[in-house]
Regions:
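Conserved CoA-thioester-binding segment of acyl-CoA-metabolizing enzymes
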Residues: 1-45, 81
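Hydrophobic/aromatic residues within transmembrane alpha-helices
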Residues: 44, 56, 105-107
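Glycine- (often His-adjacent) and acidic-residue-rich active-site loop
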Residues: 46-79
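Short glycine-rich anion-binding loops that position phosphate/pyrophosphate groups of nucleotides
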Residues: 17, 48-50, 96-97
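Crotonase-fold acyl-CoA enzyme core
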Residues: 82-159
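A short, flexible beta-alpha/helix-coil linker loop
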Residues: 16-19, 60, 119
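Catalytic-core regions built around general acid/base machinery
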Residues: 33, 75-87
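Hydrophobic alpha-helical membrane-association signature
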Residues: 26-30, 72-75, 105
Length: 159
């Protein structure tokens, strides 16, 4: 991850040429950057192909204990709250796909800018058997119109 400050704006480049998966480690790094910032705004960037493909499903499948699964989801929840609680605007520049947890990260931001291209954005959790916790549903319902909420969450429609 590459972090720098320009004109009181913290710019966080998730910095991987791949899917920018939100592992517990990466989520904690992002939380730290959001929690300890004296900047006026934060910009979060992925790469030109993928903003973030969400949680690392290998981490979930390798979790042996319920507490390990809880740690993964709780850390993602903390990251989303850190975006919401940041005193200035958090801006996600979505230059590529934003799927599942990556879409949640973009939705938790105050502003989302989609870059030109054939990229997908959506929540596929229900399609793969993952129930969204209430705090994540709250973020979604504050960011997506009521007209589209059902198809986004339960039908996993991609945009």
């Amino acid at each position: 991850m590459n972090v720098f400050v320009e004109n009181d704006v913290k710019i966080i480049e998730m910095g991987d040429k791949g899917p920018n998966l939100l592992s517990v480690e990466r989520a904690k790094q992002l939380i730290k950057e959001l929690d300890y910032s004296d900047c006026k705004a934060v910009i979060i960037l992925g790469n030109d192909k993928v903003f973030s493909a969400g949680l690392n499903l290998k981490d979930l499948s390798n979790a042996k204990e319920p507490k390990e699964v809880a740690l993964i989801f709780n850390t993602l929840g903390e990251l989303l709250r850190a975006c919401r609680d940041f005193p200035g605007p958090v801006i996600s520049i979505v230059g590529g796909h934003a799927i599942a947890g990556g879409c949640l990260l973009a939705l938790a931001s105050d502003y989302r800018y989609g870059m030109h291209g054939m990229h997908r954005m959506g929540l596929n959790e229900m399609a793969i058997g993952i129930d969204l916790p209430p705090d994540m549903l709250s973020i979604i319902s504050h960011s997506i119109s009521r007209d589209n909420l059902f198809e986004v969450v339960t039908q996993c429609k991609m945009y």
